[in-house]
C-alpha cells in the first residue's frame, strides 16, 4: 500500500492554491485565498488507485525567501505537480523548474499541468499537447504525464491529482524508454517470464483459453470474443506472423504491452506485472520469493505430494522429444523464467550429481531426486525456484509456495528403536584417500567404473532413490566432503542436525587404509553419536591384513556394532545392496549404533524367556497328554 505525497510547484500566480482548493471544495472559490495553503490529507475515494491509502497535498511558494522550504518539501515528496498558466511560466518550466529539481538530486515523477485553460480558448487541446507538452516530455524524461486544467471551471482538477497518484503507483519510467520508443530490458524480461508461465502447455503460443485464464488472473473479469479479436487484429497490423491458429506468440505479447505503454495505458502493464508479484523496480516481491518457512532443529524439509506433482508435470512439459530425459536445451528452456540453475546445483556439478540416461540426459527419477536433495539441504532455494517457475497452490488455506513443502518430525533420540519420519536422508562418506569413495558414488548413480584415480578436492554429491525391504522408497543423499571434511566434521551442532548416517570406507587391499577410520573417530568423538556403516571396498582384489591396532572385524566387534564391515566391490552386481543397507541405517538409526551391554543382556534375556516359554509349554503338553491318557484307561 502506498502513501502519495504530492508537492505542487510552479511560478507565483499560476493557480496552484486554486487547484488545491478546487480539489477540496469541488468548486472554484472566488474569495481571496491565502498565499500558501496548509498541508492537506485526502482519504481514498472512488477512482483512487486501489493500492493508495492516503494522499497528502503540499502547497509551495516560488518566492526566493521560501526557497529552503520549497527544497525541503520537494525532497519529501514522491511526485511533483508542476503548474504553468501562460507563455512566461511555460518557458520557466524548461529554464528553471526542471533543472532545479535535478539540482536537488530528486528522482520522482513530474506531472505537467497547463492551468487556466479557460483563458486560452483560442488554443485547442491537441495544439497545446503538440506544441507545448510533447517537446518538454521528449527533453525531460522525468515528466510522467501532462494535462490541461481549469480551477475556475473545475475542469480536469480531480484528474490532475489522479495522474499524480498514478505516477507513483504505476510509474512509466521503469517500463518504457521514450527516447528509444521501446520497453526497457527489465520490463521485457518480466513480460517474457509472464508469457512463459501463462503458456501452460509450453507450445510457444497463448491460446484463446490461455488468454482467457490470463485475463481472469490479472483483471478478474472474462475476456469477451470482441476483445480477443481486437487484440489479435492489433498485433497482426505490425507483426502478422505473431498471430497463428495456435494463438499469439511472445513477440506479439510483448508488442501489445509496448503499445499500452506508448499510449499512456501503462497502468494496464502494471496490473499485469503485479498480478505476477512484481514490485515497482521490476523484481519479484521478497515475501513471494522467500516466504516464512521454519525448520526446527533435528527436523528436515521435504517436498509435499503437491510439490512432487508440480515437478513431475514440469518435467513432462519440458521433455519436448519425449525421450524420458532433459537435455541441455530442454533444461535451458525450463529454467528460462529463473536466474538460471540454482547456485548449489552448479557447485554440485549438476547434472552429474543425479541419475541420467545413456545419452547423459537427466531422467525423471534424477530430476525428482535433485529437487528432493535441494529441499533437504536448502528449502529456501526450492521455495525461491517454485516462485520463479510458477507454482500455484491448490490449498486455499495456504496459497503460498510453502504448500509444496512439508516439515518432518524432529528426530532427537536416534538410539530409540523405530523408523525416522522422513523420506530423504543424508550420509557423509568418509575414508582415506584412494579408498574408493568416488567409485562408490559413481556406482550409486549406476555409472561405469573407471580405473583412473582422480583425488577429490571439491565436495561431491550424489542423490538417488533406494527401494527398502517392503517396497517403500526413500531418497538417499551421499556426499564426499573433499577439502571441506575438517570444517564439516568440526561443526558438531550442524553435523548432528543434518547428517543421518556416516559411511566409513576403506580399501581392503591396502594394508594402510583402515587405520584412518579409528584415528578419525578419535579426533572427532561426536561421530559416535551418528549411525555408522563400515564398508570394505575393492573386495574383488586380494584382501590384506591391516596395519592397525585392531583388524576391521575386531574393531567393529569391540564397538559392539550390529555387523562387521560389508565387503563389496563396485564391479559386483550386488553392489546396490550396500546402498539399501546404508539407507536402512539412516531410516532406522537404532540398528546402526554400537549395542550396549544392556542391549546384549536384553537379547539374552529375551532368548531365555522364549526358551523358558517353550519348555513350560512342552511340560504342560506332556501333563495334559498324561491326564487324557489316564482318563481313557
Swiss-Prot record:
Q: In the record, what terms sit under GO molecular function? A: calcium ion binding; GTP binding; GTPase activity
Membrane-side (Mitochondrial intermembrane) residue stretches: 625-633
Q: Where does Ca(2+) 2 bind?
A: 319, 321, 323, 330
Biological process terms from the Gene Ontology for this record are: heme transport; mitochondrion inheritance; mitochondrion organization; mitochondrion-endoplasmic reticulum membrane tethering; phospholipid homeostasis; regulation of mitochondrion organization
Q: Where does GTP 1 bind?
A: 10-17, 59-63, 115-118
Query: Where in the cell is the protein located?
Result: Mitochondrion outer membrane
Record-listed GTP 2 binding positions: 431-438, 467-471, 537-540
What residue intervals traverse the membrane?
Answer: 604-624
Q: Does the keyword Transferase apply?
A: no
Tell me the InterPro entries matching this sequence. EF-hand-dom_pair, EF_Hand_1_Ca_BS, EF_hand_assoc_1, EF_hand_assoc_2, EF_hand_dom, Miro, Miro-EF-hand_domain, MIRO_dom
Which stretches of this protein does UniProt put in the Cytoplasmic compartment?
Answer: 1-603
Bias (Basic residues) ranges: 408-418
Domain EF-hand span(s) in chain numbering: 186-221, 306-341
Q: What is its EC number?
A: 3.6.5.-
Membrane-topology descriptor: Single-pass type IV membrane protein
* Residues of the Miro domain: 1-170, 422-588
In which residues is Ca(2+) 1 bound? 199, 201, 203, 205, 210
Keywords, A to Z, come to: Calcium, GTP-binding, Hydrolase, Membrane, Metal-binding, Mitochondrion, Mitochondrion outer membrane, Nucleotide-binding, Repeat, Transmembrane, Transmembrane helix
Provide the residue span(s) of the region labelled Disordered.
398-418
What family does the entry list? Belongs to the mitochondrial Rho GTPase family.
Its function, per the record, reads: Mitochondrial GTPase involved in mitochondrial trafficking. Probably involved in control of anterograde transport of mitochondria and their subcellular distribution.
Q: What is this protein called?
A: Mitochondrial Rho GTPase 1
**Native species:** Aspergillus oryzae (strain ATCC 42149 / RIB 40) (Yellow koji mold)
> Taxonomically, what lineage is the organism?
Eukaryota, Fungi, Dikarya, Ascomycota, Pezizomycotina
Amino acid at each position: 500500500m502506498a502513501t502519495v505525497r504530492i508537492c505542487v510547484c510552479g511560478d507565483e500566480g499560476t493557480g496552484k492554491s486554486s487547484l488545491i482548493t478546487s480539489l477540496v471544495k469541488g468548486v472554484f472559490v472566488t474569495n481571496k485565498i491565502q498565499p500558501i495553503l496548509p498541508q492537506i490529507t485526502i482519504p481514498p475515494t472512488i477512482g483512487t488507485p486501489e493500492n493508495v491509502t492516503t494522499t497528502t497535498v503540499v502547497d509551495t511558494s516560488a518566492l526566493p525567501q521560501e526557497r529552503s522550504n520549497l527544497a525541503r518539501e520537494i525532497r519529501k515528496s514522491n511526485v511533483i505537480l508542476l503548474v504553468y498558466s501562460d507563455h512566461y511560466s511555460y518557458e520557466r518550466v524548461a529554464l528553471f523548474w526542471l533543472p532545479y529539481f535535478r539540482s536537488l538530486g530528486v528522482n520522482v515523477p513530474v506531472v505537467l499541468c497547463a492551468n487556466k485553460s479557460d483563458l486560452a480558448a483560442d488554443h485547442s487541446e491537441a495544439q497545446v499537447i503538440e506544441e507545448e507538452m510533447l517537446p518538454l516530455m521528449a527533453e525531460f524524461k522525468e515528466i510522467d504525464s501532462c494535462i490541461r486544467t481549469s480551477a475556475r471551471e473545475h475542469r480536469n482538477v480531480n484528474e490532475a491529482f489522479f495522474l499524480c497518484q498514478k505516477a507513483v503507483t504505476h510509474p512509466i519510467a521503469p517500463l518504457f524508454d521514450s527516447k528509444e520508443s521501446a520497453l526497457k530490458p527489465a520490463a521485457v524480461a518480466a513480460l517474457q517470464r509472464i508469457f512463459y508461465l501463462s503458456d501452460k502447455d509450453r507450445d510457444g503460443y497463448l491460446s484463446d483459453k490461455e488468454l482467457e485464464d490470463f485475463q481472469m488472473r490479472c483483471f478478474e473479469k472474462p475476456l469477451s470474443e470482441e476483445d480477443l479479436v481486437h487484440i489479435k487484429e492489433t498485433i497482426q497490423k505490425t507483426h502478422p506472423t505473431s498471430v497463428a491458429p495456435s494463438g499469439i506468440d511472445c513477440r506479439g505479447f510483448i508488442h501489445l504491452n509496448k503499445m499500452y505503454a506508448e499510449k499512456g495505458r501503462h497502468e494496464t502493464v502494471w496490473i499485469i506485472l503485479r498480478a505476477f508479484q512484481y514490485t515497482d523496480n521490476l523484481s519479484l516481491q521478497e515475501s513471494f520469493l522467500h516466504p516464512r518457512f521454519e525448520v526446527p532443529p533435528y527436523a528436515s524439509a521435504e517436498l509435499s505430494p503437491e510439490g512432487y506433482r508440480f515437478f513431475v508435470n514440469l518435467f513432462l512439459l519440458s521433455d519436448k522429444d519425449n525421450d524420458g530425459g532433459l537435455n541441455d536445451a530442454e533444461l535451458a528452456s525450463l529454467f528460462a523464467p529463473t536466474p538460471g540453475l540454482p547456485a548449489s546445483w552448479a557447485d554440485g556439478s549438476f547434472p552429474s550429481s543425479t541419475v541420467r540416461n545413456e545419452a547423459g540426459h537427466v531422467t525423471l527419477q534424477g530430476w525428482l531426486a535433485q529437487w528432493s536433495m535441494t529441499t533437504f539441504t536448502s528449502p529456501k532455494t526450492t521455495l525461491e525456484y517454485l516462485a520463479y517457475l510458477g507454482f500455484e497452490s491448490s490449498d486455499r488455506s495456504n496459497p503460498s509456495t510453502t504448500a509444496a513443502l512439508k516439515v518432518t518430525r524432529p528426530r532427537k533420540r536416534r538410539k530409540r528403536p523405530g523408523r525416522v519420519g522422513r523420506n530423504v536422508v543424508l550420509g557423509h562418506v568418509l575414508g582415506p584417500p584412494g579408498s574408493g569413495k568416488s567409485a562408490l558414488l559413481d556406482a550409486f548413480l549406476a555409472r561405469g567404473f573407471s580405473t583412473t584415480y582422480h583425488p577429490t578436492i571439491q565436495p561431491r554429491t550424489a542423490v538417488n532413490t533406494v527401494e527398502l525391504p517392503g517396497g517403500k522408497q526413500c531418497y538417499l543423499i551421499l556426499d564426499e566432503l573433499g577439502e571441506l571434511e575438517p570444517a564439516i566434521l568440526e561443526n558438531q551442532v550442524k553435523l548432528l542436525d543434518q547428517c543421518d548416517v556416516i559411511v566409513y570406507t576403506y580399501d581392503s587391499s591396502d594394508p594402510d587404509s583402515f587405520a584412518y577410520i579409528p584415528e578419525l573417530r578419535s579426533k572427532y568423538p561426536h561421530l559416535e553419536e551418528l549411525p555408522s556403516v563400515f564398508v570394505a571396498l575393492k573386495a574383488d582384489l586380494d584382501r590384506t591384513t591391516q596395519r592397525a591396532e585392531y583388524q576391521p572385524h575386531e574393531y567393529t566387534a569391540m564397538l559392539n556394532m550390529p555387523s562387521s564391515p560389508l565387503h563389496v566391490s563396485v564391479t559386483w552386481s550386488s553392489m546396490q545392496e550396500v546402498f539399501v543397507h546404508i539407507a536402512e541405517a539412516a531410516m532406522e538409526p537404532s540398528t546402526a549404533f554400537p549395542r550396549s551391554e544392556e542391549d546384549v543382556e536384553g537379547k539374552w534375556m529375551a532368548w531365555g524367556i522364549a526358551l523358558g516359554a517353550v519348555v513350560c509349554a512342552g511340560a504342560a503338553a506332556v501333563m495334559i497328554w498324561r491326564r487324557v491318557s489316564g482318563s481313557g484307561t
